[in-house]
Curated annotation (Swiss-Prot):
Pfam families per record: Nuc_sug_transp
InterPro entries: Nuc_sug_transpt (IPR007271)
Localization, UniProt: Golgi apparatus membrane
Reactions catalysed: CDP-L-ribitol(in) + CDP(out) = CDP-L-ribitol(out) + CDP(in)
Annotated organism of origin: Homo sapiens (Human)
Protein purpose: Mediates the transport of CDP-ribitol. Does not exhibit CMP-sialic acid, UDP-galactose and UDP-N-acetylglucosamine transport activity.
Lineage: Eukaryota, Metazoa, Chordata, Craniata, Vertebrata
Listed name of the protein: Probable UDP-sugar transporter protein SLC35A4
GO biological process: transmembrane transport
UniProtKB keywords: Golgi apparatus, Membrane, Sugar transport, Transmembrane, Transmembrane helix, Transport
Assembly with partners or alone: Found in a complex with SLC35A2 and SLC35A3.
Cytoplasmic compartment spans: 1-18, 74-85, 164-180, 236-250, 299-324
Amino acid sequence: MSVEDGGMPGLGRPRQARWTLMLLLSTAMYGAHAPLLALCHVDGRVPFRPSSAVLLTELTKLLLCAFSLLVGWQAWPQGPPPWRQAAPFALSALLYGANNNLVIYLQRYMDPSTYQVLSNLKIGSTAVLYCLCLRHRLSVRQGLALLLLMAAGACYAAGGLQVPGNTLPSPPPAAAASPMPLHITPLGLLLLILYCLISGLSSVYTELLMKRQRLPLALQNLFLYTFGVLLNLGLHAGGGSGPGLLEGFSGWAALVVLSQALNGLLMSAVMKHGSSITRLFVVSCSLVVNAVLSAVLLRLQLTAAFFLATLLIGLAMRLYYGSR
């Protein structure tokens, strides 16, 4: 399996096993995000500012990267610090920041279910930008596999879970909100297209940057998360009055921050040693984890749409990574 296919060529079984374990952990952390957020709710809402959670997550990632360099887990490059190579990561941080904030604004122009279904278009935008920017061609089988991933995400978002006793499927916990009719405004559609493009561009650009630079991953992450902390600190400070930085935080909230920070570090390894396509499969597979945890922790029921989505994800993985 090649790097473009998401594998790591030339590795022995122990390192390949660690790579597989890393992908499984990342999948679990992605899937646990929405259920953990739901456990943070007080009186039906998140008791802390979302910008606080994002800022603390970026700060945690930055501290972990700095610690790994200080204790020598990853060697510092010889010679003076390559600060000039830090500048390109400012664009990565800006793209990720824009992407995270667009998610919030999109909710104003469409209902949660429409967002959950149509946001799967970012799989297609990532694949197109992956081919154009990194000059990798996808086979017909691989293209079909990504289409199946999009269909699986849309299927799950449309009704993979339901409240016990309710015969109508409901959106997953991440999209749970007060009932409202399906709708999307013209501006919402434009913003959604922009969101999908930025999502794909941020992923592909970061992958290209990390692979071209011959720097330790921890140092590259140090650059990226330094800009991320500065950007999110500015957004948090400019967000107006509201709860303090740590106000409303609980043990569950701390677990959300820690899991997202660790998952961000795992994803950076995927971007450097794997590919943006690998990341898409991790995110898609996390839907299964999300559904199972929602059923166990939040007492939601799995529907036929969940099992159909799981089947589509399995078929997509078989098509993309199977023998060709």
